[in-house]
Amino acid sequence: MARLAGVDLPREKRLEVALTYIYGVGKTRAHKTLAETGISPDVRVKDLSDAELVQLRDYIEVNYKVEGDLRREVAADIRRKVEIGSYEGIRHRRGLPVRGQRTKTNARTRKGPKRTVAGKKKAGR
């Protein structure tokens, strides 16, 4: 099984798709990586030679921040925003949407399940 950046790539998939299993590598970056290294995007992971695998591993290590390093950097950025008390940091701390989305309705993913609030009693007739 091919391992790149600490991730087992699925053997049966095309290389261009398999590279997107690495955190920090999407479609565009996978396509660019294969173009730069001269490896066909249509080749299956199981058909890769060891030389091509080493070439890919070296290219990704040198040019991109992926997996653990990228996750640490993102977490540090969020932690920094929370510590300095910026608007984004406050939104992170409160578990609300950070990028200006509406919260009167929707935003259930960030806010969690609805909490029912006791309403006013109906007036008796």
Curated annotation (Swiss-Prot):
Top-level taxon of origin: Bacteria
GO MF term list: rRNA binding; structural constituent of ribosome; tRNA binding
InterPro entries referenced in this protein's UniProt entry, alphabetically: Rbsml_uS13_C, Ribosomal_uS13, Ribosomal_uS13-like_H2TH, Ribosomal_uS13_bac-type, Ribosomal_uS13_CS
GO biological process: translation
Region Disordered, residue ranges: 93-125
Cystines in this chain: none
Keywords: Ribonucleoprotein, Ribosomal protein, RNA-binding, rRNA-binding, tRNA-binding
GO-annotated cellular components: cytosol; small ribosomal subunit
Pfam families per record: Ribosomal_S13
Family: Belongs to the universal ribosomal protein uS13 family.
Function: Located at the top of the head of the 30S subunit, it contacts several helices of the 16S rRNA. In the 70S ribosome it contacts the 23S rRNA (bridge B1a) and protein L5 of the 50S subunit (bridge B1b), connecting the 2 subunits; these bridges are implicated in subunit movement. Contacts the tRNAs in the A and P-sites.
Assembly, per entry: Part of the 30S ribosomal subunit. Forms a loose heterodimer with protein S19. Forms two bridges to the 50S subunit in the 70S ribosome.
Protein known as: Small ribosomal subunit protein uS13
Gene: rpsM
